[in-house]
Amino acid sequence: MKKFKNYIEKNSERFLNELFELLRIPSISALKENDSDTRLAAELIKKHLLNLGLNNCEICETKGHPIVYGEKIIDYDLPTILVYGHYDVQPVDPINLWDKDPFEPYVKKTKIHPEGAIFARGSCDDKGQMFMHVKALEVMLDHGDLPCNVKFMIEGEEEIGSDNLEIFVKENKEKLSNDIILVSDTGMISKTIPSITTGLRGLSYMEVEITGPNRDLHSGHYGGTVANPINILSSMISSLHDSKNKITIPGFYDKVSESSDDEKKASSLIPFSIDEFEESIGINSIHGELGYSTIERQSIRPALDVNGIWGGYTDEGSKTVLPSKANAKISMRLV
């Protein structure tokens, strides 16, 4: 381990600069205007894989953003690890809540991170973790200590639902064959406790639109006589959870398995600090489905959240409009 540590310390500045180069690319998969940046990120990752001497490095086209692939086969009799990650990031709005340009990375010490942390869009979801595995492979290759075959599959659509990943996997079963998949998109229980994540929740995402009159109306004339789409949408959203914070959609829990006693016991033994959790996100009380711990709520229980809501007049000042429509974006974490 000492030789690995020495190599990392010797090359840490270069590692950081290379990561910063990747973080500066605004590879926002949800925005069409960022398509060229998203491809640029894919090309940079391919370049890093080539620099490590990986074989069959390619940018694999899909109907959306491309998937980067590369492999290092030492011996076909050895086990094979497939590293999964993604190079796309989420939109940065509202931009005014950022202290600095979200695509100009910097290191800052905070109360939560007294040793310093990298601040930038994608630094921890998922360019940072993904690049960590690329550099870990570099370290091992430099010392000739790679005990297995390694394949990389880095996609560019994770933040928008991975629409083309399933198709790619089905069409490339032989290429992607492996003994174990290492997902470089998870977290740790705490900064000092390494964690092995064995499962992740799935995602279903939708946009809801409620329509009313054929145009925006003046509430002084029409208020009280016409159904207001925002009122209807708000009522609908408020009805999605009951007083115990259970999701009220009929059939939602039909295929959700309850945790076994052994699983509950294992979950209770995880050294998870509620105080650290609350402090890290700036809250003073927890919330969620009654009867389950915070660990269970964020890992093995489904969840439904409204990710955005809009309609009517939202600019500065007042405008007594009765809107013609209202919209919301809703995500569901599935198990």
Model-identified regions with their sequence ranges:
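N-terminal helical capping/dimerization or prosegment-like subdomains
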Residues: M1-I95, K325, K329
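Active-site metal-coordination/substrate-binding segment of hydrolases
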Residues: L78-K151
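The feature captures the short pre-catalytic strand/loop hairpin that immediately precedes
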Residues: K111-I112, M206-G220
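Flexible glycine/proline-rich, aromatic-decorated loop/lid segments
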Residues: S195-T211
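C-terminal catalytic subdomain
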Residues: S235, T314-V335
